[in-house]
Amino acid sequence: MRFVDEVVIKLQAGKGGNGCVSFRREKYVPRGGPDGGDGGNGGSIYLKADENVNTLIDYRYKREYYAENGRPGEGRNCYGKAGEDLYLVVPVGTSVFDIDTNKKIGEVLQHGQTFKLVSGGKRGIGNTHFKSSTNQAPRKFTLGEEGEYKEVRLELNLLADVALLGLPNAGKSTLIRSVSEATPKVADYPFTTMYPHLGVVKVGVDSFVMADIPGVIEGAAEGAGLGLRFLKHLTRARCVLHVVDICPFNESDPVENYFAVEKELEKYSQELFDKPRFLVINKIDLLADKVEQKCQEFVEQIGYQGKYYTISAAMKKGTDELAKKLNEFLQKQE
């Protein structure tokens, strides 16, 4: 299924039903009083989060949504039926922005959570309510109100505990495949990953969610490549893994590659740059010898002071230990 993480839709809540003008007319009550009922309220439109949905693609092809109108009131004090509410099912992590103001107006972050987008119009009042001591046969009633209209932008930011960051072909997709049941495409060419993937990593009785996004290239913060569009999916992650290919097939310099990604991350968002971040040195199986020494030299060259991990995602070497350490970190954060 195609991954869509941003759409614009138009919403029209239902109109309230009109109140009714009616008088009681029975065989032995020729001049009965007013008995016009109220109309029904118009239906509202809500977002509803569903953990089984992972894309906004349904809203790419249908852009306008209408809730049901309330029915008019009837005689014998019968109220009109309320318009049925409409629920738009979206992935967990979906935010809503008002198109007119470009301000965020809400979000749904938990399975089953709802958020009202537009409110249905209020019902009209029947003539029963207008009877008084001086007006025993009122013909006054009110119309139902129009439902609220709004144009909104839905944006999906994936909810993950750990996010993978790195250049194309750094081995991020192979890593997530090796520690979870996610199945992103893996190949030896840039941008094999065209959209984000989520994988559930199980460590004993615990588990956490890992996200793989398309690789970041130089200029991503200005829109180059695919990285800019998907960097936003890192914003809700609790920590970031910077995956570096220690032995690039294109013979590029791992040190330069490391700084290129770090630079783009900082330019994109200082908040994202300040998140807990760990270095993962991948593809150590391609180093002929002195693996530990070469990895240590790389770490010293980039001036990295934090915790780092050396792995071969393809050979599943060091990946279990990495998952275990990540789980320990996440448990301490709770």
UniProtKB/Swiss-Prot annotation:
Obg domain ranges (all copies): 1-159
Locations listed in the record: Cytoplasm
CDD domains: Obg
A Gene Ontology molecular function term of the record: GTP binding
Top-level EC class as recorded in UniProt: hydrolase
Any Pfam family: GTP1_OBG
Enzyme Commission number: 3.6.5.-
PANTHER family: DEVELOPMENTALLY REGULATED GTP-BINDING PROTEIN-RELATED, MITOCHONDRIAL RIBOSOME-ASSOCIATED GTPASE 2
Task performed by this protein: An essential GTPase which binds GTP, GDP and possibly (p)ppGpp with moderate affinity, with high nucleotide exchange rates and a fairly low GTP hydrolysis rate. Plays a role in control of the cell cycle, stress response, ribosome biogenesis and in those bacteria that undergo differentiation, in morphogenesis control.
Subunit structure: Monomer.
This protein's name: GTPase Obg
Species the sequence originates in: Francisella tularensis subsp. novicida (strain U112)
